[in-house]
UniProtKB/Swiss-Prot annotation:
Entry annotation: catalytic residues: 93 (proton acceptor), 338 (s-methylcysteine intermediate)
PROSITE patterns per the UniProt record, alphabetical: RADICAL_SAM
UniProt-recorded name of the protein: Probable dual-specificity RNA methyltransferase RlmN
NCBIfam families: rRNA_mod_RlmN
Main location: cytoplasm
Natural source organism: Prochlorococcus marinus (strain MIT 9312)
Annotated residues for binding of [4Fe-4S] cluster: 113, 117, 120
Cofactor: [4Fe-4S] cluster
MF-aspect GO terms: 4 iron, 4 sulfur cluster binding; metal ion binding; rRNA (adenine(2503)-C2-)-methyltransferase activity; rRNA binding; tRNA (adenine(37)-C2)-methyltransferase activity; tRNA binding
Length: 348
């Protein structure tokens, strides 16, 4: 299969020329895909193209979409969760999170996840495979078509560990930036932190994108190594002090501050002593802490930290000179919130 989604204008012009068409036919395909974001992804429907050209493209296996719709769930707050199927019959989920002025797409980078974080539903069924850039981009089109508005912001916080799929991730970011016209500064890549991958991410970003202007969000979730290992098994391979050092280097390499995600778990990491430890870890370099309320999943017994503890924790970080914010959960009533995405449609 040859997917047209993710192709540049030049790529599409060359395809047109290869079929004996004028270069502007490639530009027409580009406009049909990216400018109109057409709901109908069938090449037969690109009526501006000659019928014989459309037939040849279709016969030769060209497609605009590799995903198909399974189901959707609309939460009370307007958040939309989509369950989509791949051509090899795997399932992925993505989420559209609307506000008055924004539509944020929460995208998956893999089918499942190998990291097995104890608080997250995605990793409970393991990793099936990584997604291609075209499959990542297709999620945007599905969200836009279902919500009838254009996506303005992207967060790679869906299923999978993006840093274990770096090249396809960056190819999708290039298209999001150049073709979907979404600034890199409106894109966030979330990672649980994989050894040696932060330096690779910055290096490959400069090679593929020419720069590195997106936000890197590291799922830290603990203020010390012992606690982190209890909730993130992969932490045994990457000490927290090394994560911080590599984060500092990422800031030097890119000029972009790093965001640290911190999931507040009652009795695990939500005490003031943890806030002080975290402050000592992060003091002195360009970073930001994002506190997150825990979203319940069936398989584990973690509990959400109280709002009082969260507020005290936030105040202590702020008083210690750490830039901190609190991210409210969206889509909780439809299992569309952070940590609740799965590979299948169970727990409806």
């Amino acid at each position: 299969m040859k997917n047209l989604l993710g192709s540049s204008i030049k790529d599409l012009e060359n395809i047109a020329l290869d079929y004996g068409q004028a270069a502007f036919r490639g530009r027409q395909i580009y406009s049909w895909i990216y400018n109109y974001r057409n709901k109908n992804k069938n090449i037969d429907q690109i009526e501006v193209l000659p019928l014989d050209f459309r037939k040849k493209l279709k016969d030769d296996g060209f497609k605009v979409s590799e995903l198909s719709f399974q189901e959707k769930k609309l939460a009370n707050d307007g958040t939309l969760k989509l369950l989509l199927s791949t051509n090899d019959n795997e399932s992925i989920e993505c989420v559209g999170i609307p506000t008055e002025k924004r539509l944020t797409a929460c995208l998956s980078s893999q089918v499942g996840c190998p990291m097995d974080c104890k608080f997250c539903a995605t990793g409970k069924e393991g990793l099936k495979r990584s997604l291609k850039a075209s499959e990542i981009l297709d999620q945007i089109l599905f969200i836009e078509n279902e919500m009838n508005r254009k996506v303005t912001n992207i967060v790679f916080m869906g299923m999978g560990e993006p840093l274990l799929n770096i090249d396809e991730l960056l190819l999708s970011i290039r298209s999001i930036n150049e073709d979907f016209q979404i600034s890199q500064r409106k894109i966030t890549v979330s990672t649980v932190a994989v050894p040696k991958m932060m330096s690779k991410l910055s290096a490959r970003s400069f090679q593929i994108l020419g720069n590195c202007q997106f936000t890197l969000a590291i799922s830290l979730h603990a203020s010390n190594q012992k606690t982190r290992e209890t909730i993130i098994p992969s932490a045994k391979n990457y000490e927290i002090k090394n994560i911080i050092e590599d984060s500092k280097q990422f800031v030097k390499d890119t000029g972009r501050r790093v965001s640290f995600e911190y999931l507040m778990l009652s009795g695990v990491n939500d005490k003031l002593e943890h806030a002080n430890e975290l402050s000592n870890l992060l003091r002195g370099f360009q970073c930001h802490v994002n506190l997150i309320q825990y979203n319940q999943i069936d398989e584990v017994e973690f509990k959400r930290a109280s709002l009082k503890n969260l507020q005290l924790f936030q105040s202590r970080l702020s008083n210690n000179g750490i830039t901190v914010s609190f991210r409210k959960s969206r889509g909780l009533d439809k299992n569309a919130a952070c940590g609740q995405l799965r590979q299948n449609a169970r727990n409806k």
